[in-house]
């Protein structure tokens, strides 16, 4: 397996970045130290609570079998498509999943390795990289719901860029790496060792 530091892909497996709002509070301290000492204390408690609630909410959104353990960092993510939606994924440079994945996808940070699984062909495509933070309805016109115009069928979204064009992987080469639950289903959230193992295989099959 390619070591993280030796991999030619050089992805960032870092912890989620701090929101800009917290940096803004940091600048405000210089303007009014006394006032913001109290505000920062309250803000710290508030932000800490929000971060904690955000983590807890992410694990409540998906059943435990479909989520990484709480003590593991998200090291990569697999998005899912079929023959009908794959070209839209690539053309828009945008990946999306159904609403139940919204909180999970919010854990994605720029630079995280991403992969695209086509369940029509049972192949895994890569290698992609998150070009934005994961969010909700980044482009609501993508995969638009015909019954509800202006709403996406796959609102859990992230912008992507192609890092390296590789031959798609067949199931027998990547499934042993993944965490499975409920028979053939596999977890879309990847831990760091799983992500590096997939990058290892793609490195050997570059187009």
UniProtKB/Swiss-Prot annotation:
* UniProt biased composition (Low complexity): 8-26, 35-52
Q: Which InterPro entries match?
A: Dev_and_cell_death_domain, NRP-like
All copies of the DCD domain together span: 72-204
- The portions of this protein that span the membrane are none
Q: Which domain of life is it from?
A: Eukaryota
Q: State one Pfam family annotation.
A: Dev_Cell_Death
A single Gene Ontology biological process assigned to it is: response to endoplasmic reticulum stress
Sequence segments annotated as region (Disordered)? 1-68
- PANTHER family attached here? DCD DOMAIN-CONTAINING PROTEIN NRP-B (PTHR46034:SF32), PTHR46034
Q: What is this protein called?
A: B2 protein
The organism's taxonomy opens as: Eukaryota, Viridiplantae, Streptophyta, Embryophyta, Tracheophyta
């Amino acid at each position: 397996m390619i070591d993280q530091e030796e991999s030619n892909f050089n992805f960032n497996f870092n912890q989620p970045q701090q929101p800009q709002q917290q940096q803004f509070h940091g600048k405000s301290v210089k303007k009014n130290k006394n006032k913001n000492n109290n505000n920062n204390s309250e803000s710290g408690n508030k932000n800490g609570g929000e971060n904690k609630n955000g983590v807890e909410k992410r694990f409540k959104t998906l059943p435990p079998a479909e989520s990484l353990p709480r003590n593991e960092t998200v090291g990569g993510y697999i998005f899912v498509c079929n023959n009908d939606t794959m070209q839209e994924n690539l053309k828009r440079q945008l990946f999306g999943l159904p609403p139940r994945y919204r909180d999970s996808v919010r854990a994605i940070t720029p630079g995280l390795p991403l992969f695209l699984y086509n369940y029509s062909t049972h192949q895994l495509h890569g290698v992609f990289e998150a070009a934005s933070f994961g969010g909700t309805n980044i482009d609501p016109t993508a995969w638009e719901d015909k019954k509800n115009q202006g709403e996406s069928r796959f609102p859990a979204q992230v912008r992507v860029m192609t890092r390296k064009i590789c031959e798609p992987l067949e199931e027998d080469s990547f499934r042993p790496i993944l965490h499975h639950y409920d028979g053939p289903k596999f977890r879309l959230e990847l831990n760091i060792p799983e992500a590096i193992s997939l990058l290892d295989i793609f490195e050997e099959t570059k187009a």
